[in-house]
């Protein structure tokens, strides 16, 4: 199992299940070349897994989170600070004081068994980003800079127009 969490604050052209939500809302990065619109923002993804992964495979797992971020429409533009961190809770890979006192054998998941975790992290990261966006509220920050929450009613309309989230017969 792998479980990402992500506080999302980044720019891009929002997509939900392939639907061009950002374009249809008229709220997206680079919508008008002459507009003085700041790109950037940041995203941080933290991934916890109970799989026994080596430090090398944890780095590989963390990199796969950005597949999910990209699926939401982020281009990870210049000025964007994008980070992913993965850690394992499996007892087999824990570095306890006893294990640090001498040579040890670490039993970790072999490379040829990790692809399903890569897929899971990409999909779960995409969902974590959507969850963060859908739970966000409008806010006013420094210098009265205001960010509006996604209009959920409009989001539902856009998704329905694209046949997403509608009941099938």
Annotate the PLM regions.
Residues 1-169:
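A structural signal for small-residue-enriched, beta-sheet-centric alpha/beta enzyme cores
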